[in-house]
Amino acid sequence: MRGDAERFWGLRPQRRLDWRDVDEQHCVVLRPRLGEGRLGRWLARHLSDPYYRIKLDTIGSFVWRACDGETSLSVIAERMRRHFGDSIEPVEERLGRFVQTMERGRLIRGLGDTDS
């Protein structure tokens, strides 16, 4: 069990979708309306707005920007703790749930099939 937790916190999630900064604290993830396949991309060219916009709050935007494929979850958690202070606790639980939700939603990759 301990090995699974260590492995989980050593993972380096990576963003799968395009995104835009709204301001210094917020960003928006751009999810294709018609999927990521060739047909979806072709059809999307004929839409005035081919994306769903997923607006992230301050904490979600902080995590999203850190999911660069190079930064481990343990480093992200420590940066969150330094940036947000006690208001973010329990940081490991919150971060773990959030990145798992993002992976299930196919927003990020790199968590594999971990259950932690």
Segments and roles (model prediction):
Residues V28-V29, R33-R53:
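Alpha-helical membrane-targeting segments
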Residues M1-E36:
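Hydrophobic packing positions characteristic
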Residues M1-L11, A44-S116:
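Long, charge-rich, low-complexity alpha-helical segments
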